[in-house]
């Protein structure tokens, strides 16, 4: 009878701990994938309060991004790691990067350190979601549950603007010229 009780106890412990091991392994795989990722090139679809925009981006850790939008205004978004510029034919907006949600999204060290401490939330069978709150902004970062790649983010800013960006056609660790991250001038 003692052997049976011991077996039942061990079986019970294994059943309880197995999901935790699987759960933590997804986090570890995402962290390891982030550590191995120096840059990404991807197509994107962005929804800002119902306005849909598409384009292509090159992201280089830490904190650099260049995006060319598919629109008639030739909109670009550029961060050199310190500043962020959104420029089009008729607009030029310059921001300190640390005042924007991209400061967090483009900071690999921040993501890794905080993913270690946060719980995962499965949105569905395809994505793993991590939620961060910083400077009155809610930021959700999405990772593919199969290959552990960054596949998007959602930001609710202090003005209650909801911006959701999904990444597709992702290519990792290409040779990238830093010149593309040069802040454009206002013309």
Predicted regions, residues:
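Bacterial N-terminal signal peptides
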Residues: 10-17
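Gly/Pro-enriched, hydrophobic low-complexity segments
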Residues: 113-187
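Boundary at the C-terminal end of the N-terminal hydrophobic targeting segment
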Residues: 19-24
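A short, Trp-centered hydrophobic/proline-enriched beta-strand micro-motif
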Residues: 32-52
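Bacterial N-terminal signal peptides that target proteins for export
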Residues: 1-9
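Flexible, surface-exposed loop/linker segments and immediately adjacent secondary-structure boundaries
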Residues: 89-127
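An acidic-aromatic
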Residues: 57-105, 163
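Sec-dependent signal peptide cleavage junction
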Residues: 25-34, 186-187
């Amino acid at each position: 009878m003692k052997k049976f009780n011991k077996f039942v106890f061990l079986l019970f412990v294994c059943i309880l701990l197995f999901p935790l091991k699987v759960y933590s392994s997804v986090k570890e795989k995402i962290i390891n994938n982030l550590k191995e990722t120096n840059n990404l090139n991807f197509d994107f679809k962005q929804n800002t309060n119902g306005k849909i925009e598409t384009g292509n981006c090159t992201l280089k850790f830490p904190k650099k991004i260049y995006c060319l939008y598919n629109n008639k205004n030739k909109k670009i978004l550029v961060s050199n790691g310190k500043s962020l510029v959104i420029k089009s034919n008729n607009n030029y907006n310059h921001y300190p990067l640390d005042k924007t949600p991209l400061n967090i999204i483009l900071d690999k060290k921040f993501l890794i350190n905080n993913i270690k401490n946060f719980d995962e939330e499965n949105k569905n069978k395809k994505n793993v979601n991590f939620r961060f709150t910083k400077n009155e902004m809610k930021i959700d970062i999405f990772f593919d549950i199969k290959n552990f790649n960054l596949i998007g983010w959602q930001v609710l800013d202090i003005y209650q603007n909801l911006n959701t960006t999904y990444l597709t056609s992702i290519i990792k660790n290409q040779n990238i010229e830093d010149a593309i991250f040069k802040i454009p001038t206002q013309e």
